[in-house]
């Protein structure tokens, strides 16, 4: 068995909590379509658009997709 650093786990977050973290890092909510909040951030000539489901608990795969699309560091969404 290998021993090494323990990888921090992602927190269980709601869609609103994820939007709050994203807003603290330059994203803004531009609209809502159904149960999805649409977050955007302008980076140079590019606009990054990330839909975030407004659910009480986001599934880990969904959260990982949001992290990947947003370009934010995973550490913002991990347990402390």
Residue ranges and their predicted role:
Residues 1-32, 38-80:
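Basic nucleic-acid-binding interfaces
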């Amino acid at each position: 068995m290998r021993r090494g650093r323990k990888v921090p786990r992602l927190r269980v977050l709601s869609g609103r909590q994820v939007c709050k973290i994203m807003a603290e890092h330059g994203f803004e909510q531009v609209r809502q379509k159904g149960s999805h909040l649409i977050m955007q951030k302008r980076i140079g000539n590019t606009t990054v658009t990330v839909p975030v489901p407004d659910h009480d608990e986001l599934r880990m795969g969904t959260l990982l997709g949001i992290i990947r699309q947003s370009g934010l560091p995973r550490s913002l969404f991990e347990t402390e």
